[in-house]
Design a protein with these regions (language model features):
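Beta-rich carbohydrate-recognition modules and glycan-binding surfaces
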Residues: 33-251
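Bacterial N-terminal signal peptides
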Residues: 16-31
């Protein structure tokens, strides 16, 4: 009886010792990992933070005479509200981009364009450094197979289109068999996509450009590589506003 109790006690003590050893080893491993993380920047997911907001652009209806018809809705430089920016248009029919409004928010609409079109914003006082954790944030809507791509114009004049695409979730309209896209807010990243040269006159995609220098970008914007489909819920895109989070570089 006594020997049995002694055996049980010794077994329990052995198990307790093993458990304590496991805890000590786990704590030691955690401390080693913590020390290595603090000493080795390779353990960090990112070595930088997202740059602050450099500029924001919301559109406005340009001045016009007469009724606000389709012709008077056409975009002009006066559609910009940010005095630090310049408007640049690309494509044979880019002048037919229009300033419209949905739910009280102005947006740019390309439903009447008969060619692919692109639009960029140029900061008058600075190049944009789009390396690292730079972001472009925007509110957009697409209809019927249309998608938006980000574009940049480098300091050397090369116009590039990125491989990222942006399209809206489509929902059925109430009481109709037609679908329409939702306005969504999304972010463009620049260090994780492929880049292709974009013909500034025809707005067609050319050859891929490997490792472009995004540290000095002259213009930033978007392109729709399809012509517009007209009024209603035909193929088109809307862009309500654009925010750019990037570092400024002296021109």
């Amino acid at each position: 009886m006594i020997s049995t109790l002694i055996g049980i006690r010794m077994s329990l003590l052995a198990r307790a010792a093993i458990a304590s050893s496991i805890v000590l080893l786990a704590c030691g491993a955690t401390n080693v990992l913590a020390q290595a993380t603090a000493a080795d920047p390779g353990f960090l997911e990112h070595d930088a933070v997202t740059p602050p907001l450099l500029f924001r652009e919301v559109w406005q209806q340009p001045p016009h005479t007469g009724p606000l018809n389709d012709e008077n809705r056409r975009i002009t430089p006066q559609a910009l509200t940010n005095p630090d920016l310049e408007l640049k248009l690309y494509g044979p029919d880019a002048a037919n981009i229009q300033v419209t409004s949905h739910n009280g928010i102005p947006d740019l609409w390309n439903g009447f364009t008969t060619s692919p079109v692109a639009l960029t914003l140029k900061h008058k006082g600075a190049y944009l450094d789009l390396t690292g954790l730079t972001r472009m944030r925007w509110r957009t809507r697409t209809e019927n197979l249309h998608v938006l791509h980000p574009i940049v114009k480098l300091a050397d004049g090369t116009l590039l289109v990125g491989s990222q695409t942006f399209e809206s979730p489509q929902r059925r309209m109430a009481g109709s068999q037609r679908f329409t896209g939702n306005f969504v807010v999304s972010e463009v990243t620049f260090d994780d996509q492929r880049w292709f040269e974009l013909d500034p006159d025809k707005v067609v995609v050319k050859l891929e450009v490997n490792n472009p220098d995004l540290s000095r970008v002259d213009e930033i914007g978007y392109v729709d590589l399809m012509p517009g489909g007209g009024h209603g819920t035909a193929g088109c895109t809307n862009v309500s506003w654009i925010e750019v989070y990037a570092a400024a570089r002296k021109r």
